[in-house]
């Protein structure tokens, strides 16, 4: 089970929708919703630039919360459309 550490975490670098822990892994979770695909698939919104921002924000969080420094990190995405909800674990790797 996940334990929510923070929601809508923000710092001067950026924002992360949800930070949660499960066992020895810290999950930095981006949530993207699209009512329809006119503006693209929700996963497409988590492009390389967005991934970099999430990663840098996660490093800021870890620097502020050193208790989690020994945790593994997973950068996850929840992609929501009218038809489905997809949880993609470790959607992108370390920059």
Language-model features and meaning:
Residues 1-12:
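A short acidic/basic microdomain associated with nuclease active sites
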Residues 11-13, 22-24, 81:
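A generic beta-sheet turn/junction motif
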Residues 13, 26-28, 72, 85:
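Structural motif
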Residues 35-60, 64:
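Mg2+/Mn2+-dependent nuclease catalytic core
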Residues 64-95:
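Domain-level recognition of nuclease-like catalytic cores that cleave nucleotide substrates
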